[in-house]
Amino acid sequence: IGGFAGCPSRELMLRWLAFAVFTPLMRNHCAKDSPPRECYRFRGRRDFESILSLRYRLLPYLYSEYMKAALRYQPMIRPLGFDFPGDSRARQCDDQLLVGDSVIIAPILKKGTVTRRVYLPEDMLQVTYGHGAFSEAPVKRGFQVIRAELGQVVFFIREGKAVPVGTACGSTDELDASSLRLLGGGCYELYWDDGETKDVGEKYLRLLRQENCPG
């Protein structure tokens, strides 16, 4: 995060960190001759804390999707064209990604901006997270303009899908599968094991449901 060499700006670190929330490895380190880039070394630590807190809150979803991808021999992070092969705009989109079955991300990549244009191949739910709070708003299929301030992360939940999120915590030891909530309007199959053994039996699969979920 921030690049292995050089001196990344605060803005670059925050934007890169917001993208890394969804990647398997979320780590910032650097070459010996480059200045340290730990988050606490930058001013305005509250923005960094905001993004890092989202990583912890999304771990139930991310862990579940990583395991499903491994067990199904399918990529977890994919270009839009993988899931929407009949949509020419989705096939041409090279700066947005599917993360698991439920989420599409569209990171802000340009310096000095807080907005960007995104393409949504179906109606979705836009989720904005910042400083401990989630806000949700339905958005229509097609091109949209989103806004994400430094310290905020925006992502999209696919129609009929859901994302489990945990409560704020500062360590994976504090994650509690019994206190999750669902974002979105669908069902979600959660993968949750003991965190220690390699037993992946069916006993570790649970089905979370919202009231508006059929069945």
Task: Give residue ranges: language-model regions.
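Catalytic-domain carbohydrate-binding cleft regions of carbohydrate-active enzymes
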Residues: 1-152, 194-196, 201
